[in-house]
UniProtKB/Swiss-Prot annotation:
Compartments reported by the entry: Cell membrane
Transmembrane segments: 15-35, 53-73, 136-156
Pfam families, per the entry: UPF0114
HAMAP family referenced in this protein's UniProt entry, alphabetically: UPF0114
Alphabetically ordered keywords of this record: Cell membrane, Membrane, Transmembrane, Transmembrane helix
This protein's name: UPF0114 protein ESA_00283
Amino acid sequence: MERFIENAMYASRWLLAPVYFGLSLALLALTVKFFQEIIHVLPNILTIAEADLILLLLSLVDMTLVGGLLVMVMFSGYENFVSQLDIHEGKEKLSWLGKMDASSLKNKVAASIVAISSIHLLRVFMDAKNVPDNKLMWYVIIHLTFVLSAFVMGYLDKISRSKGY
């Protein structure tokens, strides 16, 4: 009975495979939205205001960071929790594949969230005159919470590695 339960639990990790595949569909949706934004601005590129162009570029950078986050979670999560990716050496292989454990993935995700939050905060500040002060304050508080959380997670990870946990 114990062996059956352990084998069933171990096999259940494959339930995550469609979830990681679903992230690739989310990446496809993000890519469509990215190019939709570019196609939307191209006819107006000569008449668009500089501030509006910068806001659009920040949105594109934001989407790119989210896309990178999706790829990182998709591949390293799959490798850490489901199965090793079987990519032949002759093919192009990401240098970090197989080297990122759950702890480093957590830290990279936290750093990505801070970067995404920074871009969003910059976009908000570019339009600060149209945003109420209390809303600006909450954006900053939320961003600082992300920064502090990422710092604390990194610090705790450093402590646990030095103590051999």
